[in-house]
Each structure stands twice: as structure tokens, then as C-alpha cells.
Amino acid sequence: MAKFLITGGSGFIGTNLINKLLNDNHQVVSIDIKEPKSKEHNTIFRKVNLCNRQELESVILSYDPAYVIHLGARTDLNGKTLEDYDANIGGVKNLLFVLDKLKNLKKVIFASSMYVCQPGYVPKDFNDFMPHTIYGESKVLTEKNIIDWNPKYTWTIVRPTSIWGPYFDEPYNLFFKIVLSGKYFHMGSKACKKTYGYIDNFIYQVESIITSNKDLVDHKVFYLGDYEPYTITSWADEIAGTKNIKIHNIPYSVFVIAAFFGDCLKLVRIKFPMTSFRLKNMTTNNFFDLSEIKKLAPHLPVSRNIGTKQTVDWMVANYSI
């Protein structure tokens, strides 16, 4: 049994990760500014703001974890300035400061984001950044702050790709809802190929980093996700097939008009499932070289087909779809 601290433990990834760690009989403390998604996590939850160093220090030092998995962050794209994403910048600096004081710390995994580069851009190396959102810029600073701090303990940065599964939030839970409601349409040949990742496979990769030798993971950066990219067309058909739904094709021009309409509604703060930003993401190939993490975690435990069925079953149970 090991002692784990999970920041951002009330989020989608954190909730699933904590479930796995508890099932494996590890000791866990979860910190977040939001209440847990699962009532079973209430006893291990500590309400802590990463931007409050004193509060953070009190909880972490009293717990004295051996392993820290840092998932806590602001991840939406609605912020207007870098100050809006201070959890990803000042919060990370606070965490680095506190972790230096731990006596029994063995490894830390820091979660960054694939959005340190815009979709479709292939970086030359892990120091090549090209963010297209303020959120992405904040995650670039997350990585730079960690590297500049250069902690003495074993540390790894991971860049989650498009991770999905039970407890997920927008945009992928919305994608599932639209498909399962029969309101999704293919956009012909415009569909793209992307790296996605089922949550159980992501957790397997994280655990593989934790259990790997120091020389294989220390000061390293890994993209995490499923090893074969998906086409959104085939995945949507797979989701729809769980409910015997037939997806039809409509002209791409209709999506362009819908995106323009969505942009207009966004100006008056009305949500709409399609915007120009989302349409561009849906039609831009975006896949990554996962060969390095595959060396550490060669056999993903869950196929896309099984993950899709498990996720649909979860949505039926929780959203009455």
C-alpha cells in the first residue's frame, strides 16, 4: 500500500484515478476546490485552493505522501487573460514550493495538456510550443515553471490527449449525448483523425509511469492516449450502434452555417453545440507519437469498443438516455 495525493481529485480523470487507487488498497487524499463527484470520496476529500499556499502546505505536509499526481487546473477555454488561469501558473509554483519540503516523496506526475500546441501542429520536440488558446498558454507556463524549478525528486510531465469515459465533461459527454439522441450527422469526407484515450487506458499509463524505473521517466514528457487514432465517423457509428441508431450524412456547408449561428449565440452567452472553434477542431487531424509511453505501457487494457459500451452504460444510468 502506497500513499497518494491527487490534486484535482474531483474532476473527471481524478475521480476515475482515485477509484482505481482505492480499489488497489492504496491510501489516498484528494484535494480540490470542488466537491467530489463520487460520495465514496467524501472521507478522503480536502477542500484546498492551489492558489492558497498556506492552506496547501498545511494539508500536504500533514499527509506526507509518497506519490503525487497533479491534475488540478482550470481547463475550460472561457478565460480572457492568463490571470484567469492562475491555478495553472501560481498554483503550480505553490505546489512545487510545498513538495520540496516533503521527506518521503518518491515520484510526482504533473498533468499538462495537448493544447500546449494547436491542433494539427507537429512540434519538433517537447520544448516546441504553439498554443492557440489562453488556456494552452497557461499550460506552457505550467511546464516551463516545472522545468525551471528542476525538482530533486523524480518527476514526469504528461500531456493528456482527448480523454473520455465515465464521469467525463464537455465536449465528449456532449458528443455522446448528441449521438445517442439521434441528433448527430456525419459531415461527409471532412471528418478527421485524432488521438483519443479511454480513461482506463490513461490510468494504466499513469500507473506504468509510477512503477517504472527512475531513469525511464525522470525529467520526461509523455503524451497519453490510445495508441491508434480514431476517425470521428467510425467512432460515432460505434456509439450509435449501441442503440441501433443510424447516422446520416449532411453537406459540410450546413455545419458551417450552424457554426456561424453558434458563434452568434455565444456572443450573447447562449450555448449551442456547434461553433467555428469546435468545427475547426472536428475537421483538423490531430494525432501524436505515443511510442515512448507505449514502451512503458505496451498493452492497453480496454479496447475502444468495450470502452464505448461501458461509457454508454454509464450515461444511461446517470442521464437516463
Q: Could you tell me what each predicted segment is?
A:
Residues F4-D24:
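N-terminal Rossmann NAD(P)H-binding glycine-rich loop of SDR-like oxidoreductase domains
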Residues L50-N88, K101, P119-P123:
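NAD(P)H-binding glycine-rich loop region in Rossmannoid oxidoreductase-like domains
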Residues K93-I134, T156:
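Conserved Rossmann-fold NAD(P)-dependent oxidoreductase catalytic core, especially the SDR/UDP-sugar
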Residues C117-Q118, T156-L174:
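Flexible, glycine-rich beta-alpha linker
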Residues M130-T156:
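Active-site Tyr-X1-5-Lys
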Residues F168-L174, G188-T211, H219-Y223:
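Substrate-positioning beta->alpha
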Residues I199, D237, A258-L300:
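Conserved C-terminal active-site "lid" loop/helix of NAD(P)H-dependent oxidoreductases
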Residues S212-M274, S303-V312, Y319-I321:
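Mid/C-terminal beta-alpha module of Rossmann-like enzyme folds, strongest
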